[in-house]
């Protein structure tokens, strides 16, 4: 362990647990949790990863997010909290030594506005995750869909050790791209179509193609978003994701089904702010905000 890179993951929801499971064997990993109860359970029981019929139990080290000493020891920090939780941990991120690179893997684009607040001297990577994951409990994550992590350098530069660790697990591919805006906008576009629709309808992604009326609605939303966020072959890309994740519920659908706050403000609001000619997307946005209000989340 002494020669391995120290990698920390902030956030122990579905994505944080999935990334922890996949980085545990290639790094000296620490998972930072909001609740001490969860970090204690992870230290006692380990992390269980369910992948189809396979179940792995992985020994990991966990501690609370307020463990400043442990945070400052890391050589790479992956920020895996939900979009709406990011602002609450910004003061903590600002206190981390500037030599520690930060990799953000949030949904949406609202977090881009927060990057300048972290200063211009640290290395910041902006990424997206194509994986599907669901947290069963505090120590168990279900790998619902395999994909890639794509990232680009927002500012700064990477040392060889970090590049090597990101590229060292063929079962969990990480790709470097030239433009962070390109990868974020493409993921944002896809999420802005699939997530709110499935959240309102409370259906799996594949139903958006199977049901003729819902498919027409999907195509309408794609056309609207294209007017303010052009993405090449957008409809095809959205439909492919619906096909390959046909049996999955989107993260926003799962949030609604569990009466949790959604990431609607991070995913849809940045698009709505680009223009007014988006009536269907506006309607979906207000439907979900209204549902959140009814659930008092």
From Swiss-Prot:
Coiled coil: none
Binding sites annotated in the UniProt record for substrate: 107, 191, 195, 205, 251
Keyword Flavoprotein: no
Reaction(s) this enzyme catalyzes, per UniProt: (R)-pantoate + NADP(+) = 2-dehydropantoate + NADPH + H(+)
Catalytic machinery residues: 187
Function: Catalyzes the NADPH-dependent reduction of ketopantoate into pantoic acid.
Record's keyword terms, sorted: Cytoplasm, NADP, Oxidoreductase, Pantothenate biosynthesis
Biochemical pathway: Cofactor biosynthesis; (R)-pantothenate biosynthesis; (R)-pantoate from 3-methyl-2-oxobutanoate: step 2/2
Originating species: Listeria monocytogenes serovar 1/2a (strain ATCC BAA-679 / EGD-e)
Keyword set includes Cytoplasm: yes
MF annotations from Gene Ontology: 2-dehydropantoate 2-reductase activity; NADP binding
Protein localization: Cytoplasm
Domain of life: Bacteria
Descriptive protein name: 2-dehydropantoate 2-reductase
EC number: 1.1.1.169
GO annotation, cellular component aspect: cytoplasm
A Gene Ontology biological process term: pantothenate biosynthetic process
PANTHER family: 2-DEHYDROPANTOATE 2-REDUCTASE, 2-DEHYDROPANTOATE 2-REDUCTASE-RELATED
Protein residues bound to NADP(+): 11-16, 107, 133, 263
Membership in a protein family: Belongs to the ketopantoate reductase family.
NCBIfam families, sorted: apbA_panE, PRK06522.2-4
Pfam families: ApbA, ApbA_C
Enzyme's top EC category: oxidoreductase
